[in-house]
């Protein structure tokens, strides 16, 4: 794994947590009034996530990625991501998180990331020695996770940006509850933050605008599912689905041995 790709990978977990924080909902009482404004539904998620303090998530990735060969984009053999999994835990108050990624179709690739005490530890056994590497975390992101007021301000600003366009979809059933369905777009420019992430993508992949769909319980607003459709130009499209659970359960996240 090249250094730009490894740096991008170590930043992916805090970014993912920030996105989850922006769009997760978990607040409540039995007489919660119905919400109709998609922005209000997402704003309720900030307060609810802070109230829960911890959560578990499990996800899958599907789709195909075609890398470039000989400088021609999209000419390589397709890599199928079906069966890939993502599992992790988040402790917002403790500013800690862990995630494990498995891609069976890519030589059994596995990756682990642990963010704790302002340090991000990364391990990708398929590359290098298989040991842990460490890098100072992005303090502003870690600090924002435990600051509801700041997240509310960031959310309001994000939803008003051009191209984001949050909107309501038809309500759906999610398990034993009815759920709001809200969609919005994360423009590629918001993800890349310039050219650094794009430059780190391998094989001529080109990140496009990401379509996000969320399911939020209507009885006591709480996010239960997320779906990200990630276009990669001629390199294909990847869908990542996440399901959140175990809100408020005890979580133990510590620096890895040898990290």
Describe these PLM feature segments.
Residues 27-259:
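Subset-of-secretome marker
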Residues 1-25:
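Sec-dependent bacterial lipoprotein signal peptides
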């Amino acid at each position: 794994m090249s250094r730009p790709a490894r740096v991008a990978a170590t930043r992916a977990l805090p970014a993912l947590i920030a996105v989850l924080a922006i769009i997760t909902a978990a607040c409540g009482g039995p007489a919660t009034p119905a919400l109709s404004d998609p922005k209000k539904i997402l704003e309720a998620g900030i307060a609810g996530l802070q109230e829960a303090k911890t959560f578990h998530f499990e996800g899958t990735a599907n789709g195909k990625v075609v890398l470039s060969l000989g400088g021609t984009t999209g000419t390589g053999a397709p890599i199928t991501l079906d069966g890939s999994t993502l599992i992790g835990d988040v402790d917002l108050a403790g500013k800690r998180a862990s995630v494990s990624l498995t891609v069976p179709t890519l030589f059994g690739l596995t990756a682990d990331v642990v963010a704790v005490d302002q340090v991000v530890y990364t391990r990708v056994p398929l590359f290098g020695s298989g040991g842990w590497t460490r890098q100072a975390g992005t303090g502003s992101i870690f600090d924002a996770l435990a600051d509801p007021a700041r997240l509310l301000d960031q959310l309001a600003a994000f939803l008003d940006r051009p191209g984001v366009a949050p909107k309501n979809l038809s309500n759906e059933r999610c398990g034993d509850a009815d759920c709001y369905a809200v969609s919005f777009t994360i423009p590629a420019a918001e993800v890349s933050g310039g050219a650094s992430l794009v430059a780190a993508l391998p094989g001529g992949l080109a990140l496009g605008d990401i379509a996000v769909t969320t399911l939020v319980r209507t009885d006591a607003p709480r996010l239960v599912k997320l779906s990200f459709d990630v276009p990669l130009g001629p390199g294909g499209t990847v869908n990542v689905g996440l399901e959140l659970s175990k809100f408020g359960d005890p979580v133990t996240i510590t620096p890895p041995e040898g990290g």
